[in-house]
Amino acid sequence: MIAIAYVSNRSMLFLSTLLNYVPFLILFIKICDAVAVAKILNATLVIPHLEVNPVWQDSSTFMDIFDVDHFINILQDDILIVKEVPVEFYWSTREYYATGIRATRVKTAPVHASANWYTENVLPVLQSYGIAAIAPFSHRLAFDDMSKDIQRLRCKVNFQALAFVPHIRALGNSLINRLRYPAQGSEVSTNYLEELDNTNKKKGAGKFVVLHLRFDKDMAAHSACEFGGGKAERLALAKYRQVIWQGRVLNSQFTDEELRSQGRCPLTPEEIGLLLAALGFDNSTRLYLASHKVYGGEARILTLRDLFPLMEDKKSLTSSEERASIKGKASLLAAVDYYVSMHSDIFISASPGNMHNAVVAHRTYENRKTIRPSMALLGQLFLNKTLTWPEFQEAIREKHKNRQGQIRLRKTGQSLYTYPAPDCMCNA
Ligand SMILES: *[C@@H]1O[C@H](CO)[C@@H](O)[C@H](O)[C@H]1NC(C)=O
Ligand SMILES: *[C@@H]1O[C@H](CO)[C@@H](O)[C@H](O)[C@H]1NC(C)=O
Ligand SMILES: *[C@@H]1O[C@H](CO)[C@@H](O)[C@H](O)[C@H]1NC(C)=O
């Protein structure tokens, strides 16, 4: 009993978070699991420090992205969270762990470890030293065989405790306002609550669709598919594959046709345009493009823009002064797109991946509509050179009837953060 009291009052869980890919989305999941592990151990959690992401070169910290006070407040009845390690543990730094074997560092957490693993292997460290650092920590907590309370806590962290910092929400709300009331225009308000309030009062809000599109060079090259850009593009992508992965791209063993019919080729902006048109969207649809950088630039999205002239993005809707605080910061740019995606009437993503999974799950949790394109069907239809437009449209509509937000239950081994039902839902 004494040991436990000691643990709950003094222990710290210090987590290393080396980020990769779209940074803040990976972090979502790590921080949720960190809270769960702290709960299992009755330990205090120290807000993690982020390392600069080598790919995105983004030095944004947890506190630059998320509203930390909100985070701590929402979880105050669940666990104790502190922003910094207390003075007596100041020696417990990233450098300290990087430069030698340390008794307070736990390196052996297996992938998808059980709750028992933590009480057997980390609790003794906490009891002896008052602090433990678990690194690496990605995917180190199982999704199955966890108590209901722990699952609920993970849901609470992911869907309620993590809120973006006020300036991201303010910018996001301005974008949403301008999409809903295109004629009025509005200044970015630093008081996001006020702006949200005004939004609710105004009448005749227009609807908008968010299209999440990831079609960057990295992805195009890695898919090993062809994208109709002719010989020059084929050579450019082949060269990129050679330089970046020394040719080791798993998909290379398949032909373009095989990959396409399996739905393994990213959809091009043009293909997505045809999909949207087949589903009944038209030139009166207000479309927001949530996208980082499109390989091929404006030329590649020309067809999409022709079909949907009311297409907007972060850049078209804001001035450069308004974007100054997020300029060049991949995680903040992604956060703004995430925020707008969460508030759209319809969300459609043509790019499976972290952002896709996170937004789809969050929208499921909030019961908002999402369209999930069938990549395999699209691949097959685009290969068919004799298909007419009415046939294409018919096939698309038929296949997408039950891909418009119907809840899919999590299966064993799947992530709670991708499939929040049933664990995060009421009466589960
Ligand atoms: C944590 O606290 C709870 C409630 O006080 C207790 O039931 C549980 O055994 C504790 N767990 C550990 C690992 O100390
Ligand atoms: C939208 O499409 C309709 C029907 O194809 C056409 O008549 C109309 O001119 C278009 N409007 C704009 C603004 O392009
Ligand atoms: C192409 O589509 C047409 C019309 O649906 C169909 O009859 C034909 O079999 C398809 N061809 C291939 C190669 O799948």
Predicted regions: what they are:
Residues M1-G263, L279-F281:
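Secretory-pathway glycan-assembly enzymes, especially type II membrane glycosyltransferases
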Residues M1-N9, E258-E271, A278, L310-S344:
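Donor nucleotide-activated moiety binding/catalytic core segment of transferases
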Residues C32-N42, G273-A277, Y288, R305, ...:
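Amphipathic alpha-helical interaction motifs in eukaryotic regulatory proteins
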Residues L50-V52, D58-T61, S223-F227, R300-T303, ...:
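Short coil/turn segments at secondary-structure boundaries
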Residues E51-P54, F215-D218, H292-G296, T318, ...:
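Short, solvent-exposed loop/turn segments at secondary-structure junctions
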Residues V243-E258, N283-I326:
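Catalytic donor nucleotide-activated moiety binding site of glycosyltransferases and closely related
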Residues S374-A428:
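Leloir-type glycosyltransferase catalytic cores
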